[in-house]
Amino acid sequence: LFHAWSAGGGRGQGEKDVGQYDREDYVFGACAGAGIYRRDFFEQVGIFDEDFFIFAEDVDINMRGQLQGFKCIYLPEAKVYHIGTATVGLYSDRYIYLCKRNDIFVLIRNFSLQMYFRSLWTILKHQFNDIKYFTYRGQGIVLFKSKLDALKMLTPMLFRRFRIQSSRTVSDSKIDPLIIKS
């Protein structure tokens, strides 16, 4: 799944399984811990970007793949067991820092200006909710640092953005239906 504020999500995560995902289907992209990629995908799209380190590196590469016309197929018979935050711990300062910084990287690099402006209200709403939530948890400084450090990387991210956007072969109208707007 891909949310308009640049976060990925697990298909069916937190839902009761009543067979709603028992059929093969096209999806936005795969979790890096579960995806199997063809060699030509990496040759055309590029490899995982080291600037992400962990968290949202798969969202970034999935978006780059979508922008170049690649499709991702969900196979219901595939079973993957992945503890997504085992490395740093769920809601640890490191987790918050990397996730929230990397969300900004995804937006800067991959959204066209039109996509950005169409999603602006959702992006701002989620940014504001993050400020409220993580400040309440005592992690407001960590969140602020993540955004500040993302802005410090603006110049190299804009260069990457130019490369990504100039190599895209798919219009926003093909990508938009894959993005969850809420």
List each language-model region with its residue ranges.
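Hydrophobic alpha-helical membrane-insertion segments
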Residues: 15, 66-67, 91, 111
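Glycine-rich phosphate/pyrophosphate-binding loop
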Residues: 16-27, 33, 158-182
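Active-site-adjacent helix/loop segment of glycosyltransferases
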Residues: 72-162, 166-167, 173-177
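Short active-site alpha-helical segment characteristic of glycosyltransferases
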Residues: 60-64, 80
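Conserved short hydrophobic patches within well-ordered secondary structure
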Residues: 53-54, 62, 134
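A cytosolic small-molecule/anion-sensing beta-strand core signal
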Residues: 31, 63, 76
